């Protein structure tokens, strides 16, 4: 479905109509395909090395299309709004193949810049998102609240407090009323019909998920890799535990190896890496277990992701540190956009921090300081002091060896164009370290 630039509804649609002969040939080819025949090659994101071609047979798609609707109540009337790249397995399966299999409607946005407008216009019921988008939308909502009159600010805070209490099963008599007063206005910005945000592609910080859930906006976090066609676990609407990625899908086995690595087995697992038999053998063992490279634990049947195995930091004193939870704590600050921890072979944990430059600029302006360029902000003494305080707050409650002892400010936001982010908005740690080698060296001194 191609969106028209005119009108308030998706309205004008153009559907490609292949000629009859090519359509017949397509149907015959589809009917002749077996479940072990190759359906597609999807390349990994390349965050930890050279991208590899993942061979996904038809069974991975047919199995998941049959099972997902038993986890999330999807229907033909649903409208999906697609903005993630179709080269990414999450969007290819859950945003393209799955809705097509059930006859749902898909709208495609023109660009990220038009996403907000398209959400109001298309009025989606389901949206696949990555954590970075939810964090960005959360920041915009909070900025809007700060500009609102005091009464509206107080109502928003009360809605958050009551909503969180309701989530935890505590007494929250005003939660429903405040959701109607506050949450409904935010939902309207998303089109007014949104049933679920489904988050994948990277770990979603618990505080971000709780922010939306407290307002009555359902965010379901799932877990999967390119190697298992994007879906292995997902939270259910009736039992949504935002600190986990939910229980496994029916037919997916999850096992935790002695070293903490998550292993997966089931009909959604790839055939292997294209023309890379050694890499395939290192990832898929003889018993059919997929070694994910992720570290996690099972909690009452739900899977919780701790970090990437390759990302674990080993300090000079031998202590192991999982960077992802600490990075998430840092990013809870309204003034920190991104954080990348370092520490291998070092005396302590250190961090490269990207400030939330727009918000920092507003903060400076309120103090009477007119500094707008990121390069200037990153070295301004007021900003350095501000971020230092935010780091100290994030360190509270951490063990001493986990605390960020030193940090530097990166003088530019991360971007896809700059190479620091993948098309699905994940941080390429290797690129960041290489691009800002001077900052890394400064932290090691």
Model-derived segments and their meaning:
Residues 248-315, 332:
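Conserved ATP-binding/catalytic segment of the ANL
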Residues 87, 91-107, 120, 125:
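Conserved short alpha-helical elements in the N-terminal third of ANL/AMP-binding
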Residues 338, 388-445:
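Conserved C-terminal "lid"/linker of ANL adenylate-forming enzymes
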Residues 269, 302-331, 360-380, 400-404, ...:
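Adenylate-forming
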Residues 58, 204, 213-218, 225-243, ...:
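Active-site loops of AMP-binding adenylate-forming
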Residues 1-35, 141-185:
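ANL superfamily adenylate-forming
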Residues 39-65:
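Conserved AMP-binding A3 loop
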């Amino acid at each position: 479905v191609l969106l028209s630039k005119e009108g308030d509804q998706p309205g004008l649609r153009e559907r490609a109509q292949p000629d009859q002969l090519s359509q017949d040939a397509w149907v015959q080819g589809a009917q002749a395909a077996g479940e072990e025949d190759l359906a597609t090659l999807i390349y990994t994101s390349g965050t930890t090395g050279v991208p590899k071609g993942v061979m996904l047979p038809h069974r991975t798609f047919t199995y998941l299309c049959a099972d997902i609707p038993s986890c999330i109540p999807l229907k033909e009337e649903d409208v999906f709004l697609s903005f993630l790249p179709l080269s990414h397995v999450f969007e290819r399966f859950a945003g393209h193949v799955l809705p097509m299999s059930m006859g749902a409607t898909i709208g495609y946005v023109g660009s990220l810049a038009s996403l907000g407008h398209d959400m109001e216009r298309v009025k989606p019921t389901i949206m696949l998102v990555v954590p970075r988008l939810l964090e960005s939308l959360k920041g915009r909502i909070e900025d809007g609240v700060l500009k609102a009159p005091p009464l509206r600010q107080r109502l928003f805070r009360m809605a958050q407090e009551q909503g969180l209490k309701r989530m935890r099963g505590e007494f929250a008599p005003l939660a429903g009323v405040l959701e109607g007063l506050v949450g409904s206005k935010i939902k309207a910005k998303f089109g007014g019909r949104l049933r679920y945000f489904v988050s994948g592609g990277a770990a979603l910080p618990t505080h971000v998920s709780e922010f939306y859930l407290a307002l009555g906006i359902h965010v379901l976090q799932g877990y999967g890799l390119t190697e298992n066609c994007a879906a292995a676990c997902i939270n259910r609407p009736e039992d949504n535990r935002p600190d986990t990625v939910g229980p496994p899908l029916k037919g997916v086995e999850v096992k935790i190896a002695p070293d903490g690595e998550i292993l997966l087995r089931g009909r959604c697992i790839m055939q292997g890496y294209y023309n890379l038999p050694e890499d395939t053998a290192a990832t898929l063992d003889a018993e059919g277990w997929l070694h994910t490279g992720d570290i996690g634990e099972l909690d009452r049947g739900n899977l919780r992701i701790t970090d990437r195995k390759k990302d674990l930091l080993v300090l000079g004193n031998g202590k192991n540190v999982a960077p992802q939870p600490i990075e998430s704590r840092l990013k809870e600050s309204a003034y920190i956009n991104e954080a990348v921890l370092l520490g291998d072979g070092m005396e302590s944990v250190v961090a490269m921090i990207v400030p939330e430059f727009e918000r920092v600029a507003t903060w400076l302006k309120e103090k009477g300081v007119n500094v707008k360029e990121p390069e200037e902000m990153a070295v301004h003494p007021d900003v350095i002091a501000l971020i230092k305080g935010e780091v100290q707050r994030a360190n509270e409650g951490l063990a001493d060896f986990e605390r960020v002892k030193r940090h530097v400010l990166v003088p530019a936001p991360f971007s896809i164009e700059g190479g620091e982010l993948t098309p699905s908005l994940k941080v390429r740690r290797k690129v960041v370290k290489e691009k800002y080698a001077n900052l890394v060296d400064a932290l090691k001194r």
